[in-house]
């Protein structure tokens, strides 16, 4: 089964406040060169890729809420064989078991997705229009509903579900521990996996917070084997959410419309 790394986006960047003080006059000023990241040496025995994947999944399951920013690039292959790349940025906020908010960003104002455990709504601020429908009782079921029935895709869905290791590890034909590398200044385990239809790589933070930091997927089932790459940044694993963050209240004069791309219901 092909891995579904669905796109769209949500999350809120974290701001850090850095304090500083003037050095004593009888001492030299501190260097302005930032310290290099502390990177532990390569392990004597390479970890098993599936074990690292399970550590990530266990940690994500332990979080009752989080936010993340996803920047995704999808490769498109034209009939002329020219390759184009479409970018998407999403900020995602999740509160388990059944709350979701996604802000899809673009130059025209983007879109906003709300899921409050009962209904979901998609709002386009520029046009001041929205559509709403009944949702499933859990986040996993709602993500599947959005993708399969309404054709609303979120980025990196497979790492947002309750059991990401089970979904990601389906139909594996090989797994490789590539090594350790810095991703955005963060030491990460680089893992590579293959299935009959998809080759995919994942970079997982090394340390007490095994968070996914980067994903690359190569779709071998499509001629030309296009790729999708996603960077997951600005993780906040203990955010404070406003009480109304996940509830959609239509703005004044907003027009309610139907989901024009709704797929036929399964019989």
List PLM regions with ranges.
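N-terminal mature ectodomain segment of secretory-pathway/periplasmic proteins
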Residues: 37, 41-129
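An acidic-aromatic
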Residues: 22-23, 93-155, 221-228
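Bacterial Sec signal peptide processing site at the extreme N-terminus
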Residues: 22-38
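Bacterial N-terminal signal peptides that target proteins for export
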Residues: 1-8
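Gly/Pro-enriched, hydrophobic low-complexity segments
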Residues: 71, 121, 168-263
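Flexible, processing/modification-adjacent segments and terminal tails
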Residues: 44-52, 123-187, 193, 249-252, ...
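C-terminal motif of bacterial Sec signal peptides marking the signal peptidase cleavage site
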Residues: 18-19
